[in-house]
């Protein structure tokens, strides 16, 4: 990757930071700025010495860590990546004094280490290596309680919009002119109704051999492995609203995984959804199964996470790489509204065509995100449904890898015994009704629910280094409602802590008490101390509705283990109210039974526990 003086770097776990980086790149291209856009892990450490203007967009994962694609190269290597180089203690404090930089953090303040990743980057790049800040760091909060959008009702999209405005204002002030044919002319943006062709695109390969019966393989990512499904069993009652699966698959060579490590699964779309998408684009029918090739100035190896499908056809790309059932982000509308040109399929012809163009353009360009939120996010409307609604869209198949988002692997905590050849995951199947009264099923959990014994899955093990060094052989207090039990189960198998207290909660004892027999057996064998509560069957846990109630009932023992025996606290489960309520409860426990005089003192103690890796939280 050649060095440029402007670079946009992202660290993204779920794809949001990457999407914002791509939107910013799109805007810079409109203003004729040559630049690089890529993950932090992909960016050459050498190139930062030639870079003059750097824009960083990064989310936070795990215990305040940078996302994987910020820490590792696309090939899974850590050594030699930008972040690994920047962390070297031998670097001089003036290394980056040539660099001007701006930061945008994406976080969730229900996590204690809110936006830690962007703060780490900021502290190292600006505070310790001498880069100059263009404008103060912006931090977006997904729940709107902290950071740059604290209490103002604005979502992360509007924080990004402010970031984009400041970036463009700065660059356009710095470079009001550009060179065209050797002359200096005012810098004017390319009109938004002109599609900016991407660096890579598809074209027919000229090989007209049939592909329908050719089995698919994936090229370009040797770190992806194949597993064979051993068990895919529902472990909640059939009349319970939540379908939770115990998915077990065997690895080819065994895996050296440990408590807290995760597996990333590579799902794909159903054949029915792929065909439905092709049906919305009638001009694709004749090309859908024709062999294609990617035209790119560099290499196509890193274009799709997990390796590129072969045979490379439009149908296979839609099935394995394009996330057509995801909720569209603004970048989708920015790149596609100009293709609303087909009035022949509209009942009201050209009049309706103009209406559709106007609405799509509004989604693409309006700073008020309420309309796009109401149309896409509230009803969880998918890209497939959008193109079915807007039949005027005549999308060019050559650019689908540019305007359609790519399928990302989904991460699940390992719940089986460490270093076992058979890997067990505990997965809640996503299925719900929207305000449109339509059934929604998550892409990955839909894929998982259809797996049967003998099915082959593609996966990677992600090593998260969750367990704090030197913190073992001491008590651990595990707090985990629902499928948050998964990593706790792996931790109990490992027997690294003693004693082990498990506070587990769910709705009903007879419907969703996950792994009840196993947990009770461990409790009978004194491997764990088990405390359970069931929010919808109070007779089975009198006086205890939620996990924090069970913690409070055992407050004296919890406080003693934390303050006298330096216990580790591990909270895992759904984000939102649970981790907040658990933390508040622990503050009260410490204040009453840990001899802390007030809320401030107990909260400071919890913060010290976080900083020393004794308070661990993994929520989603």
UniProtKB/Swiss-Prot annotation:
Gene: TAH18
SUPFAM superfamilies on file: Ferredoxin reductase-like, C-terminal NADP-linked domain, Flavoproteins, Riboflavin synthase domain-like
Residues reported to bind NADP(+): 535-536
Binding partners and assembly: Interacts with DRE2; as part of the cytosolic iron-sulfur (Fe-S) protein assembly (CIA) machinery.
Gene Ontology annotations of biological process type: cellular response to oxidative stress; iron-sulfur cluster assembly; nitric oxide biosynthetic process; positive regulation of nitric oxide biosynthetic process
Cofactor: FAD; FMN
Binding annotation for FMN: 12-17, 59-62, 106-115
Organism annotation: Eremothecium gossypii (strain ATCC 10895 / CBS 109.51 / FGSC 9923 / NRRL Y-1056)
One Gene Ontology term, aspect cellular component: cytosolic [4Fe-4S] assembly targeting complex
EC number: 1.18.1.-
InterPro entries: CysJ-like_FAD-binding, FAD-bd_FR_type, Flavdoxin-like, Flavodoxin/NO_synth, Flavoprot_Pyr_Nucl_cyt_Rdtase, Flavoprotein-like_sf, FNR_nucleotide-bd, NADPH_Cyt_P450_Rdtase_alpha
Annotated keywords: Cytoplasm, FAD, Flavoprotein, FMN, Mitochondrion, NADP, Oxidoreductase
Residues in Flavodoxin-like domain copies: 6-168
Reactions catalysed according to its record: 2 oxidized [2Fe-2S]-[protein] + NADPH = 2 reduced [2Fe-2S]-[protein] + NADP(+) + H(+)
Function, in words: NADPH-dependent reductase which is a central component of the cytosolic iron-sulfur (Fe-S) protein assembly (CIA) machinery. Transfers electrons from NADPH via its FAD and FMN prosthetic groups to the [2Fe-2S] cluster of DRE2, another key component of the CIA machinery. In turn, this reduced cluster provides electrons for assembly of cytosolic iron-sulfur cluster proteins. Positively controls H(2)O(2)-induced cell death.
Residues that span the membrane, as ranges: none
Binding site for FAD: 380, 410-413, 442-445, 620
The FAD-binding FR-type domain, residue ranges: 222-475
Protein name per its UniProtKB record: NADPH-dependent diflavin oxidoreductase 1
Recorded family membership: Belongs to the NADPH-dependent diflavin oxidoreductase NDOR1 family. In the N-terminal section; belongs to the flavodoxin family.
